[in-house]
Regions:
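Intrinsic disorder at enzyme termini
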Residues: 178, 183, 188-226, 275-346
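Detector for the c-type heme attachment site
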Residues: 269
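C-terminal catalytic lobe of FAD-dependent flavoproteins
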Residues: 2, 13-16, 21-30, 34-63, ...
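Glycine-rich, N-terminal phosphate-binding loop of Rossmann-like dinucleotide-binding domains
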Residues: 7-8
Length: 346
């Protein structure tokens, strides 16, 4: 038996429990999400890695990033984007694309890169973002344990291949890894028929699900009605995610469909989505309220660092709807670790 440590930045803690050391460099990176595509191609500064040196269009938005600052491993579960990081990203980004100065910012968020540590690089900029696959049997004398870390989202299939090949070698399995040649579900090269009366919502689904969008198409009027108007997410797409994609909460639904990721940041679609989640997964009313509270709390968390202008107005209206009208407050959050984010008090 082989245990694979693929816990990202938390991999150092997992390794510690196994009695080995994987020295991680927790490098926090913050990003800004703008309300529409300011261009249709990636813009990257040709310079040594620095703050705000890449702008990436994706779906209906634009992502500007990133920063790089070392943070304590204890803080990675409760990251917050600071005002200074927002100002740095915006000032540097405007030099890259001047129109960003007048483009609405929807939210800010941060993540932590699972870099292998180096003592002589306090910022983490010079540390390789390459894949690190550790065989702890040859490295530490611990059989049946490997760590796969480093890398980036774009290289995750290569990471899977390296880890799988090492596992197969240890288990004496000689079959080749096929992840580099077998398309992911939805990426198959086949023609997809577009319904004549659903052009916009179907194109949105096609971008999210590829050839699987055919499985979501429906002639049912209710299934074709919109749950999320910003991202053109239909009832049928939500049903498909709940029935076929291992979705158990609104936040997991967001990752599958982009519900709540548009301009209103869940203000108008959260309750619609919650209704379907509750009905199809048979959640109790208490669980549903907690689900809504946790989802809206995370939306507010991303809006807080950029709460000015239209984004502040949107956040205020969301607060009035969910706290004043619906009566949702901190007591409704799903876990005691959650903290209510009231943008009006920031």
């Amino acid at each position: 038996r082989v245990t694979v440590n693929a816990a990202g930045i938390w991999g150092t803690l997992v390794a510690r429990k196994a009695g080995v050391n994987v020295s991680m460099f927790p490098a926090k990176g913050s990003l800004l999400i703008f309300g529409h595509r300011v261009n249709n191609m990636v813009i990257n500064r040709c310079r040594k890695p620095a703050n705000a040196d890449i702008l990436v269009p994706g779906d209906a938005i634009t992502v500007l990033g990133t920063t790089s600052d070392r943070v304590p491993i204890e803080s990675v579960d409760d990251l917050k984007v600071t005002q200074q990081e927002v100002e740095t990203l915006l000032s540097e980004g405007i030099q890259l694309v001047p129109s960003l100065a007048s483009t609405r910012i929807l939210r800010a968020y941060a993540g932590v890169r699972p870099l292998v540590a180096s003592d002589d690089d306090p910022s983490g900029r010079s540390i390789s973002r390459g894949i690190v696959c550790l065989d702890h049997e040859t490295r530490d004398g611990l059989a049946g344990f490997i760590t796969i870390t480093g890398g980036k989202l774009m290289t995750y299939r290569a990471m899977a291949e390296q880890a799988t090949n090492l596992v197969c070698k240890k288990l004496h399995v000689e079959k080749p890894c096929m992840t580099a040649v077998v398309p992911l579900p939805g990426a198959e090269d086949k023609e997809v028929k577009m319904p004549e009366n659903q052009i916009f919502s179907f194109m949105a689904r096609l971008g999210r699900h590829g050839s699987l969008a055919d499985n979501i198409a429906s002639n049912d009027q209710f299934d074709n009605s919109l749950i999320c108007e910003c991202e053109e997410v239909t009832v049928g797409e939500v049903k498909h995610a709940l029935n076929n994609r291992t979705v158990e909460s609104i936040d997991q639904l967001r990752r599958r469909t982009r519900v709540g990721m548009g301009t209103c940041q869940g203000q108008l679609c959260t309750l619609r989505a919650a209704c379907l989640v509750s009905q199809l997964l048979h959640h109790t009313p208490k669980d549903t309220v907690g689900n809504v509270a946790s989802f809206i709390n995370e939306r507010w968390k991303g809006m807080c660092p950029v709460a000015w202008g239209a984004t502040l107005s949107e956040a205020q209206l969301t607060t009035h709807i969910y706290q004043d009208l619906c009566g949702i407050n901190a007591h409704d959050l799903k876990t005691n670790n959650d903290k209510i984010q009231n943008v009006l008090c920031q």
